[in-house]
Amino acid sequence: MSYRMDRHSYAHTFGPTVGDKVRLADTELFIEVEQDYATYGDEVKFGGGKVIRDGMGQSPLSRAEGAVDVVITNALILDWWGIVKADVGIKNGRIYAIGKAGNPHIQDNVSIIIGPSTEAIAGEGMILTAGGIDAHVHFICPQQIETALASGVTTLVGGGTGPAAGTKATTCTPGAWNIHRMLQAADGFPINLGFLGKGNGSQPAALAEQIKAGAIGLKLHEDWGTTPAAIDNCLGVAEDYDVQVAIHTDTLNEAGFVETTIAALKNRVIHTYHTEGAGGGHAPDIIKICGELNVLPSSTNPTRPYTINTLEEHLDMLMVCHHLHRNIPEDVAFAESRIRRETIAAEDILHDLGAFSIISSDSQAMGRVGEVICRTWQTAHKMKVQRGQLPGETGNNDNLRAKRYVAKYTINPAITHGISEEIGSVEVGKLADLCLWSPAFFGVKPELVIKGGIVAYAQMGDANASIPTPQPVHMQPMFANYGGAIAATSVTFVSQKAAKKDIGEKLGLSKPLVAVKNIRQLTKRDLKLNNYLPHIEVDPETYEVRADGELLTCEPASVLPMAQRYFLF
């Protein structure tokens, strides 16, 4: 005779199931379970007196006979494609299956075999997401990587060589020699890395040599001169080598206006950093570029979301990052032209509409590398409070909004930079770069960060304690950070040309090199849940922004979730 559990008891034992709702941290966002892969009564769970024991939920099958290396049990997956409860099997560092784990000898519908070779990670009552991807990183210091990993970000794309003036401002790793040194440095970090070369040049040769050296793309930045000629030449080289171009356009409109830049693109795909403009770009109307089909638009986290403090902090940040001086009037005017409350407010709404597709950090160059994820969800919360439930939601939940926002720092940057076959979502075959969150700490502090199938960072207590939980509990590096495990669980992204030239062998690299691909044919329609193409108008006098004729405006937030409740500093 079967035993029937009430919903409350079931949720506390195996986690929520279909129809149950989960609050995300202290936000006003609630997600509802859409599907559960469990066979009720045959769920697996590890522990004393629990199911994953020999002859019960654990089979006698070997790894060679199909047992997985790691199983995450009863996790609530939140990804762009769905919100589902499932077990996740990991094998050879990749997601092997999403479904029902257990012992096929005695249980039905088993798609993930647990055996003596299987480690168990408890996902009951936890939310599982793909590791975050930050696609706008100034590699100013290596300590950024620890901070990013601890926040749930497992891939960094950007440029730089350290705390040089060029790196502080422009996200470029310029030239083959610098690219090779950064590729060698990448071997020391348990994170996926990809580097952008300098794209500012009016002749192809100097740009092509950077791609051949291993750059996964090129960055055009106004501080190096983003002229129409440089844009045209850079995109021409990118077309030849199937790499992405990221652009920070001309704030001062010296070489042309936003229309000039759009014309120079010639309908070729490009990743626009700072699409709103506070971080840089044609003043005051770079924001209108998000309505172009060939533009993959992102913005960075210092303006996410618009608050009562946003404008005040930006001026000082901008002066430092772009090597400006307060005693030079022209420098001050340059800085002030970029900070506009109207376009920052519109940025909130354009993210909520899915017109802006990606959120990244702009690390130490006006952005915070450890806050990509929490600021994304703060924006989602603010929009829920100010704009209500999204049209298209089914049921009394925020599932569509949650999927839209998680896509902004996972699958969409992966697609944009040609790495979505490897990472960017919780899907079979991809690297097992995953984050496990307690719902109360969702988006703020992950419980576990899994890199290539093994725990890389975790909330860990006193190492001299008798159990793992005594205070102080804080995020600390785990075994994936050491020795050969780094190369076994992370990859470095390079161009197809560099991969074919065996650049790894020539430089003595230990990490696997993965070539970026399928980039130049992209359009905004390829981005998930964030592909709205509005006609944007910006009033040159008032800076008011309209999308398809509708005025986009909202009030700054004075209080946010996921903030001081969770942090001492």
UniProtKB/Swiss-Prot annotation:
Active-site residue list: H322 (proton donor)
Keyword Cytoplasm: yes or no?
Answer: yes
Any one Pfam family here would be Urease_alpha
- PTM info: Carboxylation allows a single lysine to coordinate two nickel ions.
- List positions binding Ni(2+) 2: K219, H248, H274
PTM annotation (N6-carboxylysine): residues = K219
Per UniProt, the keywords (alphabetical) are: Cytoplasm, Hydrolase, Metal-binding, Nickel
CDD domains given for it? Urease_alpha
First-tier enzyme category under EC: hydrolase
Molecular function terms, GO-annotated: hydrolase activity, acting on carbon-nitrogen (but not peptide) bonds, in cyclic amides; nickel cation binding; urease activity
> What InterPro entries does this protein map onto?
Amidohydro-rel, Metal-dep_hydrolase_composite, Metal_Hydrolase, Urease_alpha_N_dom, Urease_alpha_subunit, Urease_AS, Urease_asu, Urease_asu_c
What the record says about family reads: Belongs to the metallo-dependent hydrolases superfamily. Urease alpha subunit family.
PANTHER family per the UniProt record, alphabetical? UREASE (PTHR43440:SF1)
Please give the name of this protein. Urease subunit alpha
Source organism phylogeny: Bacteria, Bacillati, Cyanobacteriota, Cyanophyceae, Synechococcales
